[in-house]
């Protein structure tokens, strides 16, 4: 018997990431090749943005995707989020010239407070929310705090791009395929302070740390390369990473919904105090997923070097959280 369609909301739907994302969702890459979807697409109520969204929708129609059971354009989150099962919050206020980080936090706090309230009011009670728009962890925290009637664990932030970037760097360093790398994960904020950790990682059962055995490379090449990759792409392409961000969003939601079969991945999720991270901080953790639920991998030893790295990214997140507290 055919499955009932799942409703998927995407914000910033006419943007670069939206354009790289929507066709893949409609093709079944995110929720499964047997799962029909209805796309509920949100853009700002600006004539140009709405017109661009219509153009993207025309292209999606022209793909004649068998799994696409419906599609609507919206300018109001209260209608866009109605009964949605998955919400991808991609649209965010980018940092403009001369804008301080505090200005950026407050501009985004307004957007994500409104979207959190709308999800709280009209989304499915089991909605799975992924925040992609930066600063992703803090935006996810704001949305979660603005939706008190939804389970807090339904709100997540995207650390999967950092995770995938780390995988590709390890693959390049070892000369092994990405698919052979297991147990690599990322702690903390989706920012240059994130801590990609391969101390437990293996390739074909062998320790990656022993294979590479180069703490200087780890500290001076690997971590800065992964942490500053977004800036390097802007420098090279003149635009921020869109296709790789869309790909990471698909990976994140697919694994959350369909399960990882015991494989460890990275998700930004609200802490319950694990590994000494204060409750409610939206933090990148190693997780496994099963039956639509994620579970933090517990019992990992955190050495002194790692403790220092985790503290740096936690301090940054605590600073961001303090910077928006008065807006909530």
Swiss-Prot record:
It catalyses: (S)-malate + NAD(+) = oxaloacetate + NADH + H(+). Its EC number is 1.1.1.37. The active site is at residue 190. Substrate binds at residues 95, 101, 134, 165. GO terms for molecular function: L-malate dehydrogenase (NAD+) activity. NAD(+) binds at residues 12-18, 108, 115, 132-134. Gene3D superfamilies: Lactate dehydrogenase/glycoside hydrolase, family 4, C-terminal (3.90.110.10), NAD(P)-binding Rossmann-like Domain (3.40.50.720). Keywords: NAD, Oxidoreductase, Tricarboxylic acid cycle. GO terms for biological process: malate metabolic process; tricarboxylic acid cycle. Belongs to the LDH/MDH superfamily. MDH type 2 family. Catalyzes the reversible oxidation of malate to oxaloacetate. HAMAP family: Malate_dehydrog_2. This is Malate dehydrogenase. It comes from Ralstonia pickettii (strain 12J). The lineage of its organism: Bacteria, Pseudomonadati, Pseudomonadota, Betaproteobacteria, Burkholderiales.
